[in-house]
Amino acid sequence: MESYDAIVIGGGPAGAASALSLLTHHNKRVLLLERGDFSQARIGEQVSHSIFDFLAYLDLPVSEFGESCFSPNYGKTSLWGSSIESHHLSMFATQGATYQLDRAAFDETLLMAFVERGGTVIPRCKQMKIEQSDSVWQVQFVHPEQGEQTVCCDYLVDASGRQSKLSAMLGVEPVMDDQLVGVGAFIRNPDNAFEQHQRIESCEYGWWYMAGLSSELAVVTCFTDMDIMREMRLNKASVWNQYLAETSAIADCVKGSETTHPKLWVKQAHSQYCTSELPDRFIAVGDAALSFDPVSSMGIGFAMTSACHSTRALVSDSKDAVLQYQQDMARIYQEYHVTKTRIYQREKRWPNQLFWQRRHAFSALQHAS
């Protein structure tokens, strides 16, 4: 049985950064396991200048990511709470410069740096089973070519994302605040270049988001609740396009564009947190620890933050350090939730629509408590 100091489950930014931190700063022999094959489309998002501090901590020069990985973001235009456009850097008032992230380039660079420094990555790991015996973790999985494998380690990191299947196996259940999903697509327009700009527009059933990823490519996503999506059939391309055409500002920006794939993606976008006590020598990072509404633009930034801080707590073998990490996560989520609530409270035009009733009712409940 192959043995490692630490195993990280999940190959996104949180997992790759955790693996890099364990290897670079704690001299651990690290294995990273990923369920997928890294071919799925990864949606870019806005990041603040602080991401470069975490890259410096991981000893990763910005030059290694390529010229197009961090594109300057020239602001955000919103139609939120009013039919009049407003222009600002971020609805969450991010300080300093912001950038549009090329997720494919970013994720690949993190993983390549991990491998080049001696880390091991195994993709396409299915049917995972986890157990702990005498403070040693055993991870079983099935690989399509190598068959059934068993590996063991001292430390286990859950970076498996919002679904946090690994944590669920261990009885660490997240608490979901809502059922938000994103239904979207990449789009191209051969006759018109996209601006490096973000647009957000609220509507009766949720809100729309658009960002120019390059002059040739943009992303458009509709955010609503799962049951509303099903009732409106927003996951059907023809219906999605119909409602997109009914938006105000975004419809004009995408006129003449075509989706790059006939099928839309549907991705979970709900807010969630974890209150369970963690098993010994185990920690959750990124979306597996806390998940944020995309309106916050906190996903990647938090992935890097939690990765760097969690690994220090994990390898300290101190329950107090892990407890402090969990308390820090609770504080971050509480602060995020207050700000997210304020954002949704700004939109008062559709008080009788289910999506907004839920946000305003939850806000009232929070104030009452």
Swiss-Prot record:
Is Cytoplasm one of the keywords?
yes
Its biological purpose is as follows: Is required for lysine-epsilon oxidase (LOD) activity in M.mediterranea. May be involved in the generation of the quinonic cofactor of LodA, leading to the active form of LodA containing a tyrosine-derived quinone cofactor.
Quote the disruption phenotype from the UniProt entry.
Cells lacking this gene do not show any lysine-epsilon oxidase activity.
Cofactor note as given: Binds 1 FAD per subunit.
Q: What is this protein called?
A: Putative FAD-dependent oxidoreductase LodB
- Specify the species: Marinomonas mediterranea (strain ATCC 700492 / JCM 21426 / NBRC 103028 / MMB-1)
- The record's EC number reads 1.-.-.-
Mention any additional remark: The intracellular stability of LodB is dependent on the presence of LodA protein.
For the ligand (FAD), the binding residues are: G10, G11, G12, P13, A14, R103
**Gene3D superfamilies associated with the record:** 3.30.9.100, FAD/NAD(P)-binding domain
Signals that turn on the gene: Forms part of an operon with lodA.
Any single GO molecular-function term of the entry would be: FAD binding
Q: Which cysteines are joined by disulfide bonds?
A: none
EC top class, in one word? oxidoreductase
